[in-house]
Curated annotation (Swiss-Prot):
One of its GO terms (molecular function) is protein serine/threonine kinase activity. It comes from the Bacteria. Its EC number is 2.7.11.1. This is Anti-sigma F factor. SMART domains: HATPase_c (SM00387). The lineage of its organism: Bacteria, Bacillati, Bacillota, Clostridia, Thermoanaerobacterales. Keywords: ATP-binding, Kinase, Nucleotide-binding, Serine/threonine-protein kinase, Sporulation, Transferase.
Amino acid sequence: MEYNNMMELKFLSKSQNESFARTVVAAFAAQLDPTIEEIADIKTAVSEAVTNCIIHAYENKIGIITIRAFILDNKITIEVIDEGKGIEDVEKAMQPLFTTRLEEERAGMGFTVMQTFMDELEVESTPGKGTLVRMTKYIGRNR
């Protein structure tokens, strides 16, 4: 597929890299002239996706997280990819409040947050191989 622009970023699954990742994606999205609310939505969704990689995919061990972002017309698609443990049942994992970590604050809300702040959300996962979260936001839709 042909895009207007694209970027790729790879970084270690360390919690201090979460804010870096969301800032890079927000800076890339800025070329679409989004509203402050649209940028905040994107940053929140990216934060959730990256945090899921750190906590669930790699279980606080070090691995590689890849973010790809693609711009086509007024649409930005963001992929957050890990090579961690994968998700056994994606449909179940996407249900609000489903969690494998009962002790965590806000547990079970990551995918719900991503769905709330983005226009489209897709999750592909293979147990033992990793997960790809694809989020899409249409910029300027409400103007």
